[in-house]
Swiss-Prot record:
Protein name: Chromosomal replication initiator protein DnaA
Stated consequence of mutating T280A: No longer interacts with itself, DnaD or YabA
Name of the gene: dnaA
Matches recorded under CDD domains: AAA, Bac_DnaA_C
Protein's UniProt keywords contain Magnesium: no
Similarity-based family: Belongs to the DnaA family.
Record region (Domain II): 83-103
């Protein structure tokens, strides 16, 4: 069969004729041919959402198109690239190789062209890690060696490591830069023993200028691999070569990691990355939208940033999902559409933040009184009773202190709040009508 890349490009050209432009641009354009093994053609999708959609909607179309081109019935399989942050639906630019082509005995690792210092969004949670990474890139083995970056999944550790690699190569094209995961290091080490090529393996990783090794926690419990990496580390460090390491936790918390490795990781600088704050999340979304030429309303970016606060990967994935959903149903992007698109991925356990003002608003609607009446000095039953219910609910449904609640009700004393809470609690024990009123108010608030 012809070259797999050529085949897939031909298939895409045919599929483009069969789909609407929005559907093709959204779902097909970002796919890549991965491999052909036996009668199974494997295609990469940018993320889980795209993979699931392709499998459910376009599997037969793709298989039929391949058959038309080759006369062969192939099974189609979709995968997501491993160790890669959320990608978008746009075609990827040519990747930059981390080493020059003429070094044939050197590992041909690739750096993600999107992971540069220019595309990294700086916030309070990553500012120090970014500064340290830039310092290392500007002066390899002279600033911090090793540089150890740790933090949760999808927070930008890999981005910074690739950015260091790009910067070094851009300023010194002859530099030998290698990026790999510790899992790949382990697998290659095992294969070198099996194939009796241990010397080749050592030469490959001990003759570099910059070694960027991701997810070092994977070495935990692997004694022989730790032994090999220990000597690799020593060789590079003694020859003033830069080492950058990432992990999901600090060295002292990696289980079954040899003390001698742990101590060496602590020779240089250890810095963490924490989840981005709201302002940083919004900035990340804006930069992503601008890079892809997307016009996303501010209210939508604020909504996504408020809902997704765990990591950058999920944040960008949510934006992709909203854009894709908008394209599919052919509607403009707004906050309501974003809520609909993300309803399946926003944690249902995430509690809504209920405020005293919101309680006053809902109680006011139930009893037909104005918001200002809650703070007024009126003592008529038509106002005082709803006010007491609102105080009761403020005590039950918010974390506000008694003085704070009193302040929100016209500067009343905290003893007034206590009295209101006790009174409504007693009435609720016997008054079914009041029970129903309070139940309805709580349901509206939730």
């Amino acid at each position: 069969m012809e070259n797999i890349l050529d085949l897939w490009n031909q298939a895409l050209a045919q599929i483009e004729k069969k789909l609407s432009k929005p559907s093709f641009e959204t779902w097909m354009k970002s796919t890549k041919a991965h491999s052909l093994q036996g009668d199974t053609l494997t295609i990469t999708a940018p993320n889980e959402f795209a993979r699931d959609w392709l499998e459910s909607r376009y599997l037969h179309l793709i298989a039929d198109t391949i058959y038309e081109l080759t006369g062969e019935e192939l099974s189609i399989k979709f995968v997501i690239p491993q160790n890669q942050d959320v990608e978008d639906f746009m075609p990827k630019p040519q990747v930059k190789k981390a080493v020059k082509e003429d070094t044939s005995d050197f590992p041909q690792n690739m750096l993600n062209p999107k992971y540069t210092f220019d595309t990294f969004v700086i916030g309070s949670g990553n500012r120090f890690a970014h500064a340290a990474s830039l310092a290392v890139a500007e002066a390899p083995a002279k600033a911090y060696n090793p540089l150890f970056i740790y933090g949760g999944v999808g927070l930008g550790k890999t981005h910074l490591m690739h950015a260091i690699g790009h910067y070094v190569i851009d300023h010194n094209p002859s530099a030998k830069v290698v990026y790999l995961s510790s899992e790949k290091f382990t697998n290659e080490f095992i294969n070198s023993i099996r194939d009796n090529k241990a010397v080749d393996f050592r030469n490959r990783y001990r003759n570099v200028d910059v070694l960027l090794i991701d997810d070092i926690q994977f070495l935990a419990g692997k004694e022989q691999t730790q032994e090999e990496f220990f000597h690799t580390f020593n060789t590079l460090h003694e020859e003033s070569k830069q080492i950058v390491i990432s992990s999901d936790r600090p060295p002292k918390e990696i289980p079954t990691l040899e003390d001698r490795l742990r101590s060496r990781f602590e020779w240089g600088l250890i810095t963490d990355i924490t989840p981005p704050d709201l302002e940083t999340r919004i900035a990340i979304l804006r930069k992503k939208a601008k890079a892809e030429g997307l016009d996303i309303p501010n209210e939508v970016m604020l909504y996504i940033a408020n809902q997704i606060d765990s990591n950058i990967r999920e944040l960008e994935g949510a934006l992709i999902r909203v854009v894709a959903y908008s394209s599919l149903i052919n509607k403009d992007i707004n906050a309501d559409l974003a809520a609909e698109a993300l309803k399946d991925i926003i944690p249902s356990s995430k509690p809504k933040v209920i405020t005293i003002k919101e309680i006053q608003r809902v109680v006011g609607q139930q009893f037909n009184i104005k918001l200002e009446d809650f703070k007024a000095k009126k003592r008529t039953k038509s106002v005082a009773f709803p006010r007491q219910i609102a105080m009761y609910l403020s005590r039950e449904m918010t974390d506000s202190s008694l003085p704070k609640i009193g302040e929100e009700f016209g500067g009343r004393d905290h003893t007034t709040v206590i009295h209101a809470h006790e009174k409504i609690s007693k009435l609720l024990a016997d008054d079914e009508q009041l029970q129903q009123h309070v139940k309805e108010i709580k349901e509206q608030l939730k």
